[in-house]
Swiss-Prot record:
UniProt name for this protein: Glutathione S-transferase U13
Modified residues (Phosphothreonine): T158
Biological process (GO), any one: toxin catabolic process
Membership in a protein family: Belongs to the GST superfamily. Tau family.
Organism: Arabidopsis thaliana
Name of the gene this protein is made from: GSTU13
Principal location class: cytoplasm
């Protein structure tokens, strides 16, 4: 597959998973056409259904005649298909395996905890779900402190694979903080993640694509019919 083949990205402005793909493409300076699915939960384009017939979700990267789906898979593909500097995944084999492990932890455990908070039916269920999400974030705080080695990002001095993976949590956490009144990123428990989130949001590869907290909360209120 030639690097200069046509590149398109099917995404949705509100999707934290689409953000992962857009940040990766920006870091690699890949020129692409962005095809937005404004409300992908209600209506999906024929191109999306054709390009990702199994999961029918964004993002989907179209590279020439190829389609690549699932956000972490897209990020890895972008890193390998455009091997120019900067590298998104670590060069060291152990560091690379570790980054993939924690990225999967985020998608499997942390998002499950987010969903549990949102779907809690009573106060007891909500308290249990909140505790689980707090636990996940405490583990990510510890991971950040070890991975960053005192620098600004999980990847060190620059945004890397685990930064991109973790970024998908920021929007959903902002929404459930607004809805539940519970603060999940706290100075006393996650000081590193708080500073990291500020740096990540302000980065030139992120800022053009990441919705503000206000935009995400407003979208969620409209979606769930919450005043």
């Amino acid at each position: 597959m030639a690097q200069n083949d046509t590149v398109k990205l099917i995404g949705s402005w509100s999707s934290p998973y689409s953000l992962r793909a857009r940040v990766a493409l920006h870091l690699k300076s890949v020129k692409y056409e962005y095809l937005d699915e404004p409300d992908v939960l209600k209506e999906k384009s024929e191109l999306l259904l054709k390009s990702n017939p199994i999961h029918k979700k964004v993002p989907v990267l179209l590279h020439g005649d190829l389609s690549i789906s699932e956000s972490l898979n897209v990020v890895q593909y972008v890193d390998e298909a455009w091997p120019s500097v900067p590298s998104i995944l670590p060069s060291d084999a152990y560091d690379r395996a570790s980054a993939r492990f924690w990225a999967q932890y985020i998608d499997d455990k942390c998002f499950a905890a987010v969903d549990a908070v949102v779907g809690a039916k009573d106060d007891e269920g909500k308290m249990a779900a909140v505790g689980k999400l707090m636990e996940c974030l405490a583990i990510l705080e510890e991971t950040f402190q070890k991975s960053s080695k005192g620098l600004g990002f999980f990847g060190g001095e620059t945004i890397g694979y685990l930064d991109i993976a973790c970024s998908a949590l920021l929007g959903p956490i902002s929404v459930i903080e607004a809805f539940s009144g519970v603060k999940f990123l706290r100075q006393e428990t996650t000081p590193g993640l708080i500073k990291w989130a500020e740096r990540f949001r302000a980065h030139e590869a992120v800022k053009p694509y990441m919705p503000t907290v206000e935009e995400v909360v407003a979208f969620a209120k409209q979606k769930f019919n919450v005043q």
